[in-house]
Amino acid sequence: MTLEQTPAPARTDVRRPASASGTTTTTRPYYKRGMLLTAGALAWAVGMSIVGSDPSGATEEAVFSTVSGLFQIGVLGLLTVLYQSQALGEGRLARFFLRLEAVVLMFAIGSTFVDGIGVSDLDKAGWMMLDLCWPLSMMGMFFIGIRIAIAGRWRGASRFWPVVAESWAVVSVPSYGLFGSTVAGFVGAAHLCVGYAVLGQIVARKQS
């Protein structure tokens, strides 16, 4: 008597795990926020190239406020990425500083909005204090960039490029005093393209 054993046919309706099939899924959790930062930086750069860094008249002010406001929203998105990824560190002080920067930036966005609709009055102390939130927020981002580099939690270009991007205030503001609003507008626009626009792409491609 002969016994013949026939193996069961392989099932074809079961999907193999990604590791077994040799394929992996790329996750980019910060993609949308990175692209928003790039779009905002480029929009503000274009607006600054057209109207300069010191707009005059209702139309120029409205255009400038719109594009700079888009940039500010992009930076606000960047702050959420930094908070989520603990880019400054895991301690309470790092979280507090990011929250404080977000509050100052939201006041700066409010300042941009009221400038755009033409209701601000810089001759009054309250409006002046609100207007100061804009440069203060940018200086805060500069210190955040330094802290990211020191903490070393982000790797590669993402560790050091924030310092480049967030040095916008320390580069562009002095150029306004030295060369006037026209030259400062082009300096600021170029810095936005090299700094924040590129940083947005780096953030968009981060996988963790």
Model-derived segments and their meaning:
Residues 2-208:
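Hydrophobic, aromatic-enriched alpha-helical segments typical of multi-pass transmembrane helices
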